Swiss-Prot record:
Function per UniProt: ATP-dependent specificity component of the Clp protease. It directs the protease to specific substrates. Can perform chaperone functions in the absence of ClpP.
Positions of the ClpX-type ZB domain: 1-54
Protein name in the entry: ATP-dependent Clp protease ATP-binding subunit ClpX
Assembly notes: Component of the ClpX-ClpP complex. Forms a hexameric ring that, in the presence of ATP, binds to fourteen ClpP subunits assembled into a disk-like structure with a central cavity, resembling the structure of eukaryotic proteasomes.
Protein residues bound to Zn(2+): C13, C16, C35, C38
PROSITE patterns on file: CLPX_ZB (PS51902)
Organism: Streptococcus equi subsp. zooepidemicus (strain H70)
Similarity comment text for this entry: Belongs to the ClpX chaperone family.
Biological process, per Gene Ontology: cell division; proteolysis involved in protein catabolic process
Signal peptide location: none
InterPro entries (alphabetical): AAA+_ATPase (IPR003593), ATP-dep_Clp_protease_ClpX (IPR050052), ATPase_AAA_core (IPR003959), Clp_ATPase_C (IPR019489), Clp_protease_ATP-bd_su_ClpX (IPR004487), ClpX_bact (IPR046425), P-loop_NTPase (IPR027417), Znf_CppX_C4 (IPR010603)
Positions with a binding annotation for ATP: P119, T120, G121, S122, G123, K124, T125, F126
HAMAP family recorded: ClpX
Amino acid sequence: MAGNRSNDIKVHCSFCGKSQDEVKKIIAGNNVFICNECVALSQEIIKEELAEEVLADLTEVPKPKELLEILNQYVIGQERAKRALSVAVYNHYKRISFTESRDDDDVDLQKSNILMIGPTGSGKTFLAQTLAKSLNVPFAIADATSLTEAGYVGEDVENILLKLIQAADYNVERAERGIIYVDEIDKIAKKGENVSITRDVSGEGVQQALLKIIEGTVASVPPQGGRKHPNQEMIQIDTKNILFIVGGAFDGIEEIVKQRLGEKIIGFGQNSRKIDDNASYMQEIIAEDIQKFGLIPEFIGRLPVVAALEQLNTEDLIRILTEPRNALVKQYQALLSYDGVELEFEKGALEAIAGRAIERKTGARGLRSIIEETMLDIMFEVPSQEEVIKVRITKEAVEGQSKPILEIA
């Protein structure tokens, strides 16, 4: 309620002491008054304190070995990729802390965004999520295939930033130190090395648009998403300290690597090194191969850290099912334990689940759906069968040849 200037008694701000005649407005509370100037000042103080809290958090970033230990609790395999990510993430946040306190003549540390290359279900998204969670920073996921360059029907790249701002509860200072994971980046590769003379709505044009926010810019983001409109209020966000991790399967890139290494299959009758079809060339990938695949040189240059993930084998998938803190087997065992029922997966069952995931080429992300198929009837029936004390999942149950074995009290 504003003070009434027609009254003889003047109202004064309880904080700065200014009268109602010296300020634009005074708000009355329970025996307390505050002027518009003190409201604005308090908002500025809160904003600065929030920013200081964000910076304070960054001074306690785990060391690379500590980050690796955290990743090992949740992510099986991919040792080289986990090491590369741990070092890159640590250096990124160390750079932010250094930049905030450096002198003008100090070394200017460049941002090291990350490119993850690996088959579907190898753990790219999960690695990025786990890192963000362990650092307690805002995290957003975007799909590159939904993006188009400005002026075309589709999603503007700025909407990626809106997702991060929303993940930070609209605290822009926190969002400016968050992590964004852009998936399916290989799907916006050019169709060839030569620049096309036609418009490339979802390829090179999107790479150019992403390039601007990845390398660092002050972007204007519509608060409600969608396209920008004249006279629309915008959120300003500086992307120079946002860590961008982009990932994709890059199907066929190993053939490009083989060609570069001189191991391309040569016609009949000619001498050539024999190719080991079971060998992986993922760790041999260099920038030249990625450019040949279809990413533009400027875009590759902003992704100096390349983490290659291998195809997960049967042993890896079994470990994923059983070892991590949030392993699927542990989750289902916990669910049935709430009904007083013990759940056991035989070794053959685990091998069958892993084998199905490999057959379907879904990797780790396909494990849950396979277990759901196997467990559906059990999860439906057992809670009503009080006499059941244990459920045993066999290989035959996974393959649909028989039902799981129930043990009765």
